[in-house]
Amino acid sequence: MNHMELGPSTILGVGLIIIGLFLYALKLREPYVSRDYDFFFSCIGLLCGGILFFQGWRLDPILLLSQILLSGTTIFFIAESLYLRKNLNFVKSKKKYINLAKKNIYKYIYENFKLKKKWNELNYTRHIFYKKKKH
């Protein structure tokens, strides 16, 4: 016999189940963004979501608050990680263009940077001499 109620724990459990399914489907839909360990986190999300869905009515209010905060933080970091992975793949595809742009910037800086003195005349270090005291 299962006892369920529609409350914040049930909604949180459904949310975690949806996020777990999303991570699992991500490997099939966009394999260049997905990593191998996403399957592990997908299983954890499904398990925790199922527990909250079926047993969430037993939670104390403070424990429910901690579950809400922890799940919200986890979902935020999942979204941020996927966003950064997608941008990393975009940058890797544009790497050749970025390297050319860097070379042009450095070339411009060095061509327009002129010193009044010659390189041999520049002294950046100052030597400090000391003598040991004789006892």
From Swiss-Prot:
Keywords: Chloroplast, Plastid. This is Uncharacterized protein ycf66. It comes from the Eukaryota. GO terms for cellular component: chloroplast. It comes from Marchantia polymorpha (Common liverwort). InterPro entries: Uncharacterised_Ycf66. The keyword Plastid applies. Belongs to the ycf66 family. It is found in: Plastid, Chloroplast.
